[in-house]
Amino acid sequence: LKLPNFTKNTVATRATEQQINKLCVLCYDADDKYLGMSTISRDSIKDKGGDTYEVRVKVVPRTATLHLVTNTNVTLDEARDYDSGKNNLYNATREGNLNLDAPICWGSVKVDDLLSPSTKVWLFRQFAKASVTKDDDKVKNFEITGFKLFNTAKRGTIATTKLYTNVSLPSSVDYTNENDYSMGEHPFYETPAGKAYMIIKAKYNNGPETYYKVAFQTKNSDGTFTPMALLRNHHYQVKVTAVNHAGYSSEKEAKDNLPENGLSVEVVDDNPRIVNMIACKDYELGVC
């Protein structure tokens, strides 16, 4: 028997959430064929502070690329295609409740790049998240009691080849609505353009709770509007900046109609900044 040697190198990993409980390291050769994987436990992951972690990994000989996946187990069938033996990780999916505190993240790196001690591997959450606040200086007569996301994808892929450009959808996907209105950060699987929308539940002028529909569209340079894809690893921070009357009287009415006239919001994405989204049935909803 020949027991192959292992090459040791240090990988500094960075995530945008709070904790890495375990790390799965997958090895692929120059032709993207699967070579093997190992799992690193929490005890072997060194927290360097500032959302930076350091681990030592054993790299199988002939490895050209490492894929790193946090906080979930990866099966052999997810790691490699049965017939070709090549990387199948881009087809691996997860569904169900999302964990903001210990998120499933993915990243990849060329082994040659690890020869530099300064190399960092960036890990990306497989989901997006949204939150809602109001501008207290501009909005005095509006109490937000919660919000819900509608028609977001029910599942998502672990890895992606479209990180900065578009969503990576599973081969088949259903869409779902959140069950309850609440505040805080709501995680959701990345969703293609033209699908998802938000309903904010709030009290206007100390009146009863009413419902405001907010869609997601991007304003183009020519003034037209295009539905906006909601991408993984983005935080869509919605801030209400103006309200001039109550919303729809029921959730169903809000769902069945265009965004209600009179609610203006600013949306700040934790990657690029997008502003001046106006929820209004008299105009196209957009961001600019």
Regions found by a protein language model. Name each.
Residues 1-5:
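Conserved aromatic anchor
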Residues 10-80, 129-232, 242, 246, ...:
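Tryptophan-paired
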Residues 42, 75-118, 210-221:
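Structured interaction patches on ligand/partner-binding surfaces of diverse proteins
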Residues 55-56, 116-120:
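Catalytic micro-motifs at enzyme active sites that drive phosphoryl/nucleotidyl and oxygen chemistry
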Residues 122-125:
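Interdomain boundary/hinge segments at the C-termini of tandem beta-sandwich modules
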Residues 226-236, 255-258:
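Intrinsically disordered, low-complexity segments enriched in small/polar residues
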Residues 238-240:
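Broad, structure-driven detector of short, well-ordered beta-strand segments within folded domains
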Residues 242-287:
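Intrinsically disordered, low-complexity repeat and linker tracts
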